[in-house]
């Protein structure tokens, strides 16, 4: 029998059909090779948008810099970065007038945070430009290297452990005439391989001391390394993103803390909240506009898109904003916050790895590093690349390009949102002084604008005024990519609104399935994803039940753990059948041991081990939850773990799931090949750093973060904490006298060893 597909939709309101339009099957595109070209594009484009600005030369680094601020007012619709200082300051003043005390209160909150934040805040985050080695490293390693070199150069304020003191060291380091650093270099030698008898190139890494003069150090401190943004769907061209170094990170963090605090108080801001909270906030703004427009007014909404948001923003503008926001605050606080925008006004973009050349005839490949682009003969390049290099050459110093205007992706999301909201705020009738008025939503570079007016001419006039006002602060609404609709239907940050936000369940599809961490985590993540989608994304009970059955099937195929009584033959089926036959209570076996699935949509919140515990044979319980099992290398299990799930687009999301430690929570061993390479030393450093941090966390569980103040090292802090805890435990009778004595003895030994060192 043929099914007419339209019948499926007869009873469905059209907005619910959005999940059938899902375009993102298959893997997203990843970038390969060098990002140098994309970075040059960014630098050249940014300068083009500000080309009518004034050129100056940085006295310290000799870098040529373009300043478009208070440049010519735009005469056409081309995107431009000529923000007018007085307009930005006025927008800030009006924002404060509409929200009395907002800046004052946010400053007070931030000041408190600034004084309490520890330097280990900077270990969060992924890849970071490590200025000591001139390449990217994990954040924790980059921070450790920076602090080590600061200390060896006599900068020791950071020993207090407060972030603000580390930043004092950063400031001082910039005044020093030179900095001595330890850097890595590679030696290559040709040796004969014992096994294959072929000649191979062996690489070893050496460490050497190197002096950087003031200019070289400043260039490194102001450098943002660049990479290609991966896994971006719906784009033909890749684009570059930036990773700043440790000198910039701390200052940016404090600015963003202040901006976040302001955003939390602004009803038009889509940051920093997310998910359902964000939807509720946005729905309020829409409701307000629609209620007012019921009788006499028309209401239209623009689903907005800005042209090259961050390439037209300017750090100098952010400096003006911060100067205004903090105007009544203590001098030290104003100084700390103004450093990030000042550093960004003087930033250098590192061009990345350079270009790879190969000669087909001679089977030769060679890499032209970015440092050589300044003076290499251009005849080797194609026309497109030639043009890029010619354009960027005047800006190059040591393989980095001077990039004063523009912000680079993802650096000041919160602060730029404040700027956007300040323009939305000007739409109130008391400011427009006419019959039209506007309001809207802003989240970083994404916006939705709702305009109300008595007639169509008024709507048009309102949109025009908004467009021009934005131009004055360096925001360029794209007329080509924005579209207007009757209020009630629009899109904002991938939320679709039609008489309320529509659950677009298909966006979550890529996160369904088996994650591939281990049997225990995968089961837990799988059911949690289904549970979360029932809560947040209108995943109905029937569909959820089906998703669950598909997931279990997928899980059994992944881990080859079909039920013990199945006919399917796999590598594991022999063992699993044997286990099935020996087990009295078969319902107690975990799915990964060939047991039945006991999950249904009512009990997804219970970890599988807990669900089946009462049903398990005793000896099975003993084997399953046995920390001494020699075949399993264990993670320490917190009650809640975090998994990274990938929605169809937007950033990877972190999702909490319950973790119960069993012999199935194994960790795959690290690939051995790295241990035989030059990277081994770095790996060992990292592991040691990890171990120290974990140990420290044991002594100071986050619930009791009364951190030791005025103690110069982690070791001293841990020893003093151990003594206090031991005394409390001894006095309350939790430990015996002998144990107490032993702890005290160990503490003394540690202190003795430190003194000898």
Curated annotation (Swiss-Prot):
A motif (Nuclear localization signal) lies at residues 187-195, 203-216. GO terms for biological process: DNA-templated transcription; symbiont-mediated suppression of host gene expression; symbiont-mediated suppression of host mRNA transcription via inhibition of RNA polymerase II activity; viral RNA genome replication; viral transcription. PROSITE patterns: RDRP_SSRNA_NEG_SEG (PS50525). Residues 52-82 are annotated as: Disordered. GO terms for molecular function: nucleotide binding; RNA binding; RNA-directed RNA polymerase activity. GO terms for cellular component: host cell cytoplasm; host cell nucleus. Phosphorylated by host PRKCA. It is found in: Host nucleus; Host cytoplasm. Residues 286-483 form the RdRp catalytic domain. Keywords: Eukaryotic host gene expression shutoff by virus, Eukaryotic host transcription shutoff by virus, Host cytoplasm, Host gene expression shutoff by virus, Host nucleus, Host-virus interaction, Inhibition of host RNA polymerase II by virus, Nucleotide-binding, Nucleotidyltransferase, Phosphoprotein, RNA-directed RNA polymerase, Transferase, Viral RNA replication, Viral transcription. It is an enzyme of class 2 (transferase). Residues 55-64 have a biased composition (Polar residues). The keyword S-adenosyl-L-methionine does not apply. It catalyses: RNA(n) + a ribonucleoside 5'-triphosphate = RNA(n+1) + diphosphate. Residues 249-256 are annotated as: Promoter-binding site. The keyword Nucleus does not apply. Its EC number is 2.7.7.48. It comes from the Viruses. RNA-dependent RNA polymerase which is responsible for replication and transcription of virus RNA segments. The transcription of viral mRNAs occurs by a unique mechanism called cap-snatching. 5' methylated caps of cellular mRNAs are cleaved after 10-13 nucleotides by PA. In turn, these short capped RNAs are used as primers by PB1 for transcription of viral mRNAs. During virus replication, PB1 initiates RNA synthesis and copy vRNA into complementary RNA (cRNA) which in turn serves as a template for the production of more vRNAs. Belongs to the influenza viruses polymerase PB1 family. Influenza RNA polymerase is composed of three subunits: PB1, PB2 and PA. Interacts (via N-terminus) with PA (via C-terminus). Interacts (via C-terminus) with PB2 (via N-terminus); this interaction is essential for transcription initiation. HAMAP family: INFV_RDRP (MF_04065). This is RNA-directed RNA polymerase catalytic subunit.
């Amino acid at each position: 029998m043929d099914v007419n597909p339209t019948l499926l939709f007869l009873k469905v309101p059209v907005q619910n059909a959005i999940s059938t339009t899902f375009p993102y099957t298959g893997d997203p595109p990843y970038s390969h090779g060098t990002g140098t070209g994309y970075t040059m594009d960014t630098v050249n484009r940014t300068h083009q948008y500000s080309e009518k600005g004034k050129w100056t030369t940085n006295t310290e680094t000799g870098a040529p810099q373009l300043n478009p601020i208070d440049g010519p007012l735009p005469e056409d619709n081309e995107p431009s970065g000529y923000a007018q200082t007085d307009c930005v300051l006025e927008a800030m003043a009006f924002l404060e007038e509409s929200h009395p005390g907002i800046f004052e209160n946010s400053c007070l909150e931030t000041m408190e945070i600034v004084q309490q934040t520890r330097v280990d805040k900077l270990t969060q985050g992924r890849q970071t430009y490590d200025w000591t080695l001139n390449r990217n490293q994990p954040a924790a390693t980059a921070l450790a290297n920076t602090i080590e070199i600061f200390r060896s150069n006599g900068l020791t304020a950071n020993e207090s452990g407060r972030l603000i003191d580390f930043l004092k060291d950063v400031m001082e380091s910039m005044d020093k005439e030179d900095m001595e650093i330890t850097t890595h270099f590679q030696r290559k030698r040709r040796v004969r391989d014992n096994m294959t008898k072929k000649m191979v190139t062996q690489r070893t890494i050496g460490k050497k001391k190197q002096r950087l003069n003031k200019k070289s150090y400043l260039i490194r401190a102001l450098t943002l390394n660049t990479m290609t943004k991966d896994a971006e769907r719906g784009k033909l061209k890749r684009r570059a993103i930036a990773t700043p170094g440790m000198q910039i990170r701390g200052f940016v963090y404090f600015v963003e803390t202040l901006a976040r605090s302001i955003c939390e108080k602004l009803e038009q801001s889509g940051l920093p909240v997310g998910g359902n909270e964000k939807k509720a906030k946005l729905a309020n703004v829409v409701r307000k506009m629609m209620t007012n427009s019921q009788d006499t007014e028309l209401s239209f909404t623009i689903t907005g898109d800005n042209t090259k948001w961050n390439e037209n923003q300017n750090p100098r503008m952010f400096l003006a904003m911060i100067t205004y926001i903090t105007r009544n605050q203590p001098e030290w606080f104003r100084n700390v916050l103004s450093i990030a925008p000042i550093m960004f006004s003087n930033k250098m973009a590192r061009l990345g790895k350079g270009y790879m050349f190969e000669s087909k005839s001679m089977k030769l490949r060679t890499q032209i590093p970015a440092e050589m682009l300044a003076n290499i003969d251009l005849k080797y390049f194609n026309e497109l690349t030639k043009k890029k290099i010619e354009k960027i050459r005047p800006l190059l110093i040591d393989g980095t390009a001077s990039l004063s205007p523009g912000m680079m992706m993802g650096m000041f999301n919160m602060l730029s949102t404040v700027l956007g909201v300040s323009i939305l705020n000007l739409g109130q009738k008391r400011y427009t002084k006419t019959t039209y008025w506007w309001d809207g939503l802003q989240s970083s570079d994404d916006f939705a604008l709702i305009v109300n007016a008595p007639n169509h001419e008024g709507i048009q006039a309102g949109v025009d005024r908004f467009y021009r006002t934005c131009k004055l602060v360096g925001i360029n609404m794209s007329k080509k990519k924005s579209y207007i609709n009757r209020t009630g239907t629009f899109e904002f940050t991938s939320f679709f609104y039609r008489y309320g936000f529509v659950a677009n369940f298909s966006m979550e599809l890529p996160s369904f399935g088996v994650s591939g961490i281990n049997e225990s985590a995968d089961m837990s993540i799988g059911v949690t994803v289904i549970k979360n989608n029932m809560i947040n994304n209108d995943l109905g009970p029937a569909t959820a039940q089906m998703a669950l059955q598909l997931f279990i099937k997928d899980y059994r195929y992944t881990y080859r753990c079909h039920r013990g009584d199945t006919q399917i033959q796999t590598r594991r089926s022999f063992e699993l059948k044997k286990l099935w036959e020996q087990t009295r209570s078969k319902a107690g076996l975990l799915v990964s041991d060939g047991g039945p699935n006991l999950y249904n949509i009512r009990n997804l919140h219970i970890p599988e081990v807990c669900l089946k515990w009462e049903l398990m044979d005793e000896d099975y319980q003993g084997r399953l939850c046995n920390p001494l099992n020699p075949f399993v290398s264990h993670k320490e299990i917190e009650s809640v773990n975090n998994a990274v799930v990938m929605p169809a687009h937007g950033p990877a999301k972190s999702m909490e799931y319950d973790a119960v430690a069993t012999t199935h929570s194994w960790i795959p061993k690290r690939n051995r090949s790295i241990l035989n390479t030059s990277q081994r030393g770095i790996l060992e450093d990292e592991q040691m750093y990890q171990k120290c941090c974990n140990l420290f966390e044991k002594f100071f569980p986050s619930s009791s973060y009364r951190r030791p103040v005025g103690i110069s090292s982690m070791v001293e802090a841990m020893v003093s904490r151990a003594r206090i805890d031991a005394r409390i435990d001894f006095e309350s009778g939790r430990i015996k006298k002998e144990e107490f004595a032993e702890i005290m003895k160990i503490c003394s030994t540690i202190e003795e060893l430190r003194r000898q060192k």
